[in-house]
Regions:
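Amphipathic alpha-helical domain-onset/packing element
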Residues: 1-25
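Short flexible coil/turn linkers enriched for glycine and charged/polar residues
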Residues: 10-16, 28-33, 43-46, 58, ...
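Flexible glycine-/small-residue-rich
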Residues: 20-24, 39-43, 66-68, 130, ...
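C-terminal lobe/lid and adjacent interdomain/linker elements of RecA-like ASCE P-loop ATPase modules
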Residues: 35, 91-174
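GG-anchored amphipathic helix commonly corresponding to the ABC/SMC/Rad50 NBD signature/C-loop
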Residues: 37, 41-43, 57-79
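Conserved D-loop-proximal element of ABC-family nucleotide-binding domains
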Residues: 73-74, 86-94
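Walker B catalytic acidic pair
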Residues: 82-83
Length: 174
């Protein structure tokens, strides 16, 4: 609980509280315990089941915090996040990006994201492009060079000259 609280503070939860409840469950492929995460994002609000009270963006950040805590103990060399930054933006997205980049110092991290605040911190930036001929949809993936990366971040920011300047600034801040 302490480690989870510390990690979520980094992700923008200044006063969140957690309680982990471990209850016996029918033994199966996932073990013989059932873990429930009780959560409160704000002081004075009682702890309740995470899935009942947290927004989708809050759940994503809590899951990133859980993965971060577990990654320190696990010997798993690769972490894959598929839109772990969903439904967040602004300063929170910057914090999430920094946490993912921090994980990448000791693990191989593959992160699928639509947020320029997160993408800018990637060591390598890949673009997945879909195309269709009306019958089939195909996906292509390719690594972006520095110039293409600026263009892609600018596109993600909405396009235009201001977005291009913003993309260049974001990449310089890395």
């Amino acid at each position: 609980e302490k480690l989870l609280t510390e990690e979520t503070e980094k992700l923008g939860f200044a006063q969140a509280r957690f309680k982990l409840e471990i209850n016996p469950a029918e033994p199966g492929p996932n073990g013989a315990d059932k873990l429930q995460i009780l959560f409160s994002a704000n002081p004075g609000v009682p702890l309740k089941l995470l899935q009942d009270v947290a927004s989708s963006g809050e759940i994503c950040r809590v899951m990133l915090a859980v993965k971060t805590v577990l990654a320190e103990a696990d010997e798993i060399p690769v972490l894959i996040f598929d839109e772990i930054d969903a439904n967040i933006g602004g300063e929170t997205a910057m914090r999430v990006g920094a946490e993912i980049a921090s994980l990448g110092r000791n693990k191989q991290v593959i992160c699928i994201s639509h947020l320029p605040q997160v993408v800018r911190l990637a060591e390598r930036h890949f673009l997945v492009a879909k195309s269709t001929d009306g019958v089939e949809t195909r996906s292509r993936i390719g690594v972006l060079d520095d110039a293409q990366r600026v263009q892609e971040l600018a596109r993600m920011l909405g396009g235009g000259d201001a977005a291009l300047k913003h993309a260049e600034a974001l990449l310089k801040e890395r």
